[in-house]
UniProtKB/Swiss-Prot annotation:
Keywords, alphabetical: Acyltransferase, Transferase
SUPFAM superfamilies per record: Acyl-CoA N-acyltransferases (Nat)
Name of the top EC class for this enzyme: transferase
N-acetyltransferase domain sequence ranges: 6-155
GO molecular function: L-glutamate N-acetyltransferase activity
UniProt GO cellular component terms: cytoplasm
GO terms for biological process, alphabetical: L-arginine biosynthetic process
Family of the protein in this entry: Belongs to the acetyltransferase family.
Protein name per the record: Uncharacterized N-acetyltransferase CT2212
Matching Pfam families: Acetyltransf_7
Acyltransferase keyword on record: yes
Length: 155
């Protein structure tokens, strides 16, 4: 079982290409916005990776909005490792780090609300997060017809 042999760790610069490849598949499906390798390198300290026997098979990132509010973003797992608990491991690691930092509320924008609901997230209106809208959504090509669901969890 891959989850049992998978370690979730802080991303390293050497992981940037793997993160790009993993997220590119999701971007191609319209599930997330494309991030360049340069952007990933610039934000590498925000990323965690799932490492399975030396191979990066998944990733997620965190973004702070206030000292008490953060977002989990860029959650992606290689197709052959999906539905094996890898996404859960990544989210749990991100939540643990955020909790250690004193964050008490974490949100996501997702097309997979069922996954996050099972992780204890509740649906909420996007307008609850004006910081996110002003930072990221204004430049999003889907901003006028956003199909993502905002969800929040208290840590």
């Amino acid at each position: 079982m891959p989850a049992a042999d998978t370690c979730v760790r802080n991303a390293r610069l050497a992981d940037a290409s793997a993160i790009s490849r993993i997220t590119e598949g999701y971007a191609g499906e319209g599930i997330m916005l494309k991030r360049s390798v340069e952007n990933i390198i610039e934000h590498i300290r925000d990323f965690f990776v799932a490492d399975y026997k030396g191979q990066v098979i998944g990733c997620c990132a965190i973004a702070f909005y206030t000292v008490k509010l953060a977002e989990i973003r860029s959650l992606a797992v290689l197709e052959e490792f999906r539905n094996k608990g890898i996404g859960r491991l990544l989210v749990e690691k991100a939540e643990a780090v955020l909790s250690e930092e004193g964050v008490n509320e974490v949100f996501v924008l997702t097309l997979n609300s069922g996954f996050f609901k099972r992780m204890g997230y509740k649906e909420i209106e996007k307008e609850y997060f004006p910081q996110k809208i002003w930072r990221d959504c204004t430049n999003c090509p889907k901003r006028m017809a956003c199909d993502e669901i905002a969800m929040v969890k208290t840590l």
